[in-house]
Amino acid sequence: MVENQRAMPQPEMRRIRRIHFVGIGGVGMCGIAEVLLNLGYEVSGSDLKGSAVTERLESFGAQIFIGHRAENTIGADVLVVSSAVNTSNPEVATALERRIPVVPRAEMLAELMRYRHGIAVAGTHGKTTTTSLIASVFAAGGLDPTFVIGGRLNAAGTNAQLGTSRYLIAEADESDASFLHLQPLVAVVTNIDADHMATYEGDFNKLKKTFVEFLHNLPFYGLAVMCIDDPVVREILPLVKRPTLTYGFSESADIRAINVRQDGMLTFFTVLRRDREPLDVSVNMPGNHNVLNSLATIAIATDEGVSDEAIVQGLSGFQGVGRRFQVYGELPVDGGHVMLVDDYGHHPREVAAVINAVRGGWPDRRLVMVYQPHRFSRTRDLYDDFVQVLADANVLLLMEVYPAGEEPIPGADSRNLCHSIRQSGQLDPIYIERGVELAPLVKPLLRAGDILLCQGAGDIGGLAPQLLKSPLFAGAKVASTEGKLK
């Protein structure tokens, strides 16, 4: 792929020179900012604190402000905001007062997609991995796509890149219904689950109808690629009045996986496609959920004319995405080592998928899990599901809920989760007070051969690298970006 190339700005946005991002360090914002920089626009942005992301953008020429102030918008032709930013933000308030357009990030993404062959990946779970797989397979096929992903693609070292072809591959975010701005030519729906329900006023039917509306943004000649194994996707399938291609383990799927076998990080399977020879593939990720993500990729790649050789190469050479079952390395313990894994999963279905992947790839190993729930509202709404799935670990340490800006909700916290899991009789979880150093707590619980999984969408993302650097684990082996030990 071509990285950091400079191109001419899009002619349809010729009146726009400087684009300002409010919250530029966010995972959904920085990728769009990087693509716009590489298209030749002036980009500025603000965030509450600096990070590796803002430093990277600054190295490409973006002007970065720490803190939100009215004067940051001077010279901006448009402001791009995420759903987390409201009109009380001083930069937004100033822009509105000066009649500077303020647009959601999805609207800017839609503008980038407008004159390209857009491929949008939607669904409650698996968006980031599926989008990354499609980008990797297209690159292996020589198509050099532009991509905007909600996670760091390890092979590229970034979550966004400007390619030279007509393809733009991006995640479609249902959390705030902003994916309705997008008008792709191909859309994927991986699954539909109860999450971010405040956006849909707690009405699951409204969520389902919104997904149908998203698919009807496709032109009549577009393509909806849908996972037929998901019961809700299967339910809305008859309502979709666009060409469809289904995938899954089901015998009725257009693109189907059989003979699935897992060996540690590697998953092998055979793909059946109508009017084609069976295709044997492997992917460097564990779990049936990643087989489904791969099938969505194969469906689109096949439809776009990518060769089978490129599909096999792109999947087998895939180096993963940051915080999606990311192997950080091995920690030394008495008698051997423990494999250290970090994962972003924060919904019971995602937690279950990862636990099943561990059981499938390493059936003889214990799973020691450090989990941090994300949002009090999610913990409340899915409380019983969390109790059930978290009890499947062999050893469980529960960090306090990461609030993500929410106020505490009575009963929807980790102390209560611990109590409920203990009451089930399957497990005796350990509650971790906020601010407690974890390495001294974790080490005595570990045995040689264990898998230590740190999981959640909050600041637990910093735990795995901290453990690797802890003096208590001196001599730890660090994995490469491919998840292999150096």
Swiss-Prot record:
Family: Belongs to the MurCDEF family.
Pathway(s) the chain acts in: Cell wall biogenesis; peptidoglycan biosynthesis
Name this polypeptide is given: UDP-N-acetylmuramate--L-alanine ligase
Cystine pairs: none
Binding site for ATP: 123-129
Reaction(s) the record says it catalyses: UDP-N-acetyl-alpha-D-muramate + L-alanine + ATP = UDP-N-acetyl-alpha-D-muramoyl-L-alanine + ADP + phosphate + H(+)
One cellular component (GO) term of this entry: cytoplasm
Protein origin, superkingdom: Bacteria
InterPro entries listed in its UniProt record: Mur-like_cat_sf (IPR036565), Mur_ligase_C (IPR004101), Mur_ligase_C_dom_sf (IPR036615), Mur_ligase_cen (IPR013221), Mur_ligase_N (IPR000713), MurCDEF_pg_biosynth (IPR050061), UDP-N-AcMur_Ala_ligase_MurC (IPR005758)
One GO term (biological process): peptidoglycan biosynthetic process
Gene Ontology molecular function: ATP binding; UDP-N-acetylmuramate-L-alanine ligase activity
Family annotation (HAMAP family): MurC
Keywords: ATP-binding, Cell cycle, Cell division, Cell shape, Cell wall biogenesis/degradation, Cytoplasm, Ligase, Nucleotide-binding, Peptidoglycan synthesis
Role played: Cell wall formation.
Enzyme nomenclature, EC number: 6.3.2.8
